Regions:
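Metal-ion/cofactor- or nucleotide/acyl-coenzyme-handling active-site neighborhoods
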Residues: 1-366
């Protein structure tokens, strides 16, 4: 039982048959996988929201600053994080299909007396850890657990039938602020906007290297800030001016941001090491997030170009005409392609159906 509905009495109703490969079609089905990195603030969100494909969201993806409407409202949503972190406008919205871990089915929804299993369009799943060789596995009855909402969403999307994932707002990096960089440079730290800080922890200059990891930036500051301890350096960096961590109104303490950035870096390595598995499963992961760590290992596409291609593939209602659809001969709409359509049965199909029917009859209980 991969996906199921749940009740407050603990009973479960299998929904796998209705959901697995629901979105698969004659061509590899595309979707937007929406994150909450700062890059989404510069993305063409109106065109993305209007594009004719499903938007899969994680956590607070698509949210802007407090007091503003969501920039993108997801069609499908999931999160690895605690239920209490998120708003009821996600859980109680029947337009958003939610996928939650099985242990969250009786969590209370913030601001309500409802449990997660009471919410509309909400499904649950059990999870498991897997290696890179079976990173995505259609034979499993569980979703991949990598302690990460993005990877969880990727596996859910795969089981729903999506094969092309266009990732927007998926930065997978927390960069130091301009003020923090200026402070570091004034203390003799070598920082490059593209490749990050020059790490000099080894005395041999030949072993120095560039790193875009926030932990390396802070550690280098500790080495160069005149003998100050780690706590004092972090406080000084925080007071200089905070880094932009998300597209929405929230900023973690710098110590927590360091941990989050290391998590992002590691999960990108997971995806890099799983590329052959993704290829074998027919999955294409495409970054549409400028400056994302994904861009080192996966192809990058401009989101507007992707929007245009999606619209061209699905059809543009703005260019379609309804005149004549009731008053004319609608067969004209397909007549040109009819000469190329000749449906045929599979080889020896009548005998195959007969054999299957006999086999089912023979195996039926008496």
């Amino acid at each position: 039982m991969l996906f199921f509905r749940a009740s407050t009495d603990g009973t479960a109703t299998d929904a796998t048959a209705a959901l697995e490969n629901l979105y698969a079609g004659n061509d590899p089905t595309a979707c937007w996988l929406v994150g909450s990195g700062p890059s989404i603030l510069g993305a063409p969100v109106e065109q993305i929201a209007a594009s004719p494909v499903v938007k899969i969201g994680v956590n607070f993806s698509g949210r802007g600053p407090d007091g503003t409407a969501p920039r993108i409202t997801p069609d499908i949503w999931t999160s690895f994080d605690p239920t209490s972190r998120f708003h009821r406008s996600i859980f109680l919205n029947p337009r958003i299909t939610k996928f939650l871990k099985a242990d969250k089915q009786k969590d209370l929804i913030p601001g309500t007396t409802f449990k997660a299993c009471d919410c509309p369009a909400t499904y649950f799943f059990r999870s498991e850890t897997r290696g890179y060789g079976d990173f995505l596995d259609s034979r499993s009855d569980r979703i991949l657990n990598a302690l990460d909402s993005f990877i969880q969403a990727l596996d859910i999307g795969y089981r729903l039938g999506f094969r092309r994932f266009f990732c927007v707002g998926a930065d997978f990096i927390i960069r130091p602020s301009d003020a923090q960089v200026s402070l570091a440079v004034s203390c003799g730290i070598d920082f490059d906007e593209t490749s990050g800080v020059l790490v000099t922890k080894d005395a041999d200059p030949k072993l120095h290297y560039r790193s875009d990891r926030l932990v390396d930036f802070v550690d280098e500051c500790i080495r160069k800030f005149g003998g100050k301890d780690r706590r004092a350096v972090i406080e000084e960096l925080e007071s200089a001016g905070r880094e932009q961590q998300y597209s929405f109104s929230e900023t973690k303490p710098l110590a927590a941001a360091i941990h989050a950035d290391s998590h992002y870096w590691e999960r990108v390595q997971y995806l890099r090491l799983a590329r052959r598995n993704l290829s074998l499963r027919g999955v294409s992961l495409v970054s549409c997030s400028p400056g994302s760590r994904l861009n080192d290992w996966f192809s990058f596409r401009e989101p507007l170009t992707v929007c245009d291609e999606m619209t061209a593939a699905c059809g543009d209602p703005r260019e379609e005409r309804t005149v004549g659809r009731y008053s004319g001969d609608v067969r004209d709409a397909v007549r040109e392609s009819l000469p190329h359509h000749r449906d045929v049965s599979p080889y020896d199909w009548a005998q195959t159906v007969s054999r299957r029917a006999k086999s089912d009859l023979d195996s039926a209980p008496t």
